[in-house]
Amino acid sequence: MLCVNVELKERRYPIYIGSGLLSDEKCYPLKSGDKVMIVTNPTIAQYYLSQVTDTLVKKGCLVEHVVLSDGEQYKTLDSLNLIFTALLQGNHGRDTTIIALGGGVIGDVAGYAAASYQRGVRFIQIPTTLLAQVDSSVGGKTAVNHALGKNMIGAFYQPCTVIIDTLTLNSLPKREINAGLAEVIKYGAILDLPFFTWLEQNIDSLVARDPDNLQTCIARCCQIKADVVARDETEKGDRALLNLGHTFGHAIETHLGYGHWLHGEAVAVGMLMAAVLSEKLGNLTKTDVARLERLLARANLPTVSPDTMQPEDYLPHMLRDKKVLAGKLRLVLLASLGQAYVATDTDPALVLDAIRCCTQVN
């Protein structure tokens, strides 16, 4: 088992990474008599709910669960209310612990419930998708979507522990593994050129779910994110760099309707758009852009805009992005491979040109 610590100003919490951790009582910071509400979805429940429940019952915990519908389209206030109702019906107080057992959607909704219920209760993340393990479970971002924008209603609320059992990746569809690799590639592109090069050498084994390389990869991503979050917990500086490709990607998700493309698929195209824009600004070479495009393609990720979306469709969505200040776009771009920065007041015409370069030719 590996352990990465997230060091915050006022406290720290561990990320445990290893095989078989769902059944390891030592990973759960709970004691006999503690009340627990597990939040999960039907897909994950059939694989892992009884395993986690049995582990907690052995510790003497009082365990209940709520099962939410599966998919990004259910990351809503309605789902949040289902959690609140279950907590209230079970007479859960401020001393309860909410456990998110699932992917990014479950983690985000359960985390926001933990932040909101009785003004805050303890929260444990057990991410079961690659994307959640390397990204959304770490750092305390919680949210639900609105019809007009992704993650528009939420809070920064840190878990007390993150438990990453790599065995859960064995039950994932290939498409979910590939979507998670988009966020993995992002870390190398923004902050770690040696890691990007390592990915170029090992991407095929990651697609094939080699357990040793996956554990190495997850630990590296968690360490990069932990370091960034330690410097900037509430995204007032460096943490924004973690959003490479996300402004473009969120536009895709919002325009198509949540759930049509996976988050990682949209981010993959968004990263390439950001790279093309960076090349047009004179930061990257065409070879740099080609390296990123090739790596995304080897991870079986899309590299062109959805064929139902026109370049002009992007900007209205992008202008609702949370990084927009005074009505002006702020985009995460690349100064070089392995070094990102936040660009302010980028010419919208140049942004549109970069989007066109990544648009499918019919």
Swiss-Prot record:
Residues annotated to bind NAD(+): 70-75, 104-108, 128-129, 141, 150
Gene3D superfamilies noted in UniProt: 3.40.50.1970, Dehydroquinate synthase-like - alpha domain
Binding site for Zn(2+): E183, H246, H263
Keyword Nucleotide-binding recorded: yes
InterPro entries noted in UniProt: Dehydroquinate_synthase (IPR050071), DHQ_synth_AroB (IPR016037), DHQ_synth_fam (IPR030963), DHQS/DOIS_N (IPR030960), DHQS_C (IPR056179)
Pfam annotation, one family: DHQS_C
Reaction(s) catalysed by this chain's protein: 7-phospho-2-dehydro-3-deoxy-D-arabino-heptonate = 3-dehydroquinate + phosphate
Main location: cytoplasm
Any one annotated GO CC term: cytoplasm
Family: Belongs to the sugar phosphate cyclases superfamily. Dehydroquinate synthase family.
Name of the protein in its database record: 3-dehydroquinate synthase
Taxonomic path: Bacteria, Pseudomonadati, Pseudomonadota, Gammaproteobacteria, Pasteurellales
